[in-house]
From Swiss-Prot:
PANTHER family per the UniProt record, alphabetical: ELONGATION FACTOR TS (PTHR11741), ELONGATION FACTOR TS, MITOCHONDRIAL (PTHR11741:SF0)
Residue segments, region Involved in Mg(2+) ion dislocation from EF-Tu: 79-82
Free-text function comment from the UniProt entry: Associates with the EF-Tu.GDP complex and induces the exchange of GDP to GTP. It remains bound to the aminoacyl-tRNA.EF-Tu.GTP complex up to the GTP hydrolysis stage on the ribosome.
Family: Belongs to the EF-Ts family.
GO terms for cellular component: cytoplasm
Pfam families per the UniProt record, alphabetical: EF_TS
Name of this protein: Elongation factor Ts
CDD domains named in the record: UBA_EF-Ts (cd14275)
Cytoplasm in keyword set: yes
Listed NCBIfam families: tsf
Keyword vocabulary terms for this entry: Cytoplasm, Elongation factor, Protein biosynthesis
SUPFAM superfamilies: Elongation factor Ts (EF-Ts), dimerisation domain, UBA-like
Compartments where located: Cytoplasm
Length: 298
């Protein structure tokens, strides 16, 4: 398979690898982007990406809590200028409040909002502002108590990253602190049991290959039993601790894990939602010359 400059650019942007390393990785894996990432990681040339794709879309995430229920809603726009528009922000706030009464995004589109459906309100706002918008997704969570946090807030309950944390037990403020922690660390899952088994096995394969190659290149190679019983399990333990909420060191007090902090506060974390604007979306771009030509032609 021919390796293009665009493929090299994409791999470099997703891994931080150098140009020649990225090109070699793609060549070695016949252009398979996912395999190329793993190849770079076995060579110690790239870190694991927590989420595929770059965040390039604009818009806002809205969060709302009512009793023991919390919701997060993402609405995308074409430009950040519209995301700062008061009418757009009011609309997203309305959608978020409406989401408290439904369970999925399709039901939300059909939900009533001031005598009109959410979908109708969206289309009318598009017509007024003159820019395309999308009600992309919603998430709902419940518990004895739910805390919400918005990072980079544009207005009350609106921002680029929205987090919800549901807990069992009387919340004394720890849930809000954990929500702030989640915004900063972006854990993949609540616990090891919640991680995608395919992801875990892929990580194990990467760490196994990396350990074997490092050992083969060592002046004093270790026995295979040490690799299998000590080194690989140790690396997997670190991976799980770094990527599961309960296993992470608590940002506010790194001497304890999040699980320990919750236990000390007398609560059990039931689940969380972390929603970032444009997660997994890559906005189509035009080069500057094409953009100027398009403007002049218009």
């Amino acid at each position: 398979m021919a390796i293009t400059a665009q493929m090299v650019k994409e791999l470099r942007e997703s891994t931080g690898a150098g140009m020649m390393d990225a090109k070699k990785a793609l060549t070695e894996t016949d252009g398979d982007m996912e395999a190329a990432v793993d190849w770079l990681r076995t060579k110690g040339l790239a870190k694991a990406a927590k989420k595929a794709g770059r965040t390039a879309a604009e818009g806002l995430v809205g969060v709302a809590v009512s009793g023991g229920t919390g919701v997060a809603v993402e609405v995308n726009s074409e430009t950040d200028f519209v995301a700062k528009n008061a009418d757009f922000q009011t609309m997203v706030t309305g959608f978020t409040q409406a989401a408290l009464s439904v369970d999925d995004v399709e039901a939300l589109k059909a939900a009533d909002m001031g005598g009109k459906t959410v979908e109708t309100t969206l289309q009318e706002t598009i017509a007024v502002i003159g820019e395309n918008m999308t009600l992309r997704r919603m998430a709902k969570i419940s518990g004895d108590s739910v805390a919400a946090y918005v990072h980079n807030a544009a207005a009350d309950g609106l921002g680029k990253i929205g987090v919800l944390v549901a807990v069992k037990g009387a919340d004394n403020g720890i849930a809000k602190q954990i929500a702030m922690h989640i915004a900063a660390t972006s854990p993949m899952a609540l616990s090891e049991a919640d991680l995608d088994p395919t992801l875990v096995e892929r990580e194990r394969a990467v760490q196994t290959q990396k350990a074997l190659e490092e050992n083969a290149a060592s002046a004093k190679p270790k026995p295979d039993s040490v690799i299998e019983n000590n080194i690989i399990p140790g690396r997997m333990k670190k991976f799980l601790e770094e990527n599961t909420l309960l296993g992470q060191k608590f940002v506010i007090n790194p001497d304890v894990t999040v699980a320990e902090a919750a236990k000390q506060a007398g609560v059990e974390i039931l689940g969380f939602v972390r929603m970032a604007v444009g997660e997994g979306i890559e906005k189509e771009k035009e080069d500057f010359a094409a953009e100027v030509a398009k403007t002049l032609a218009g």
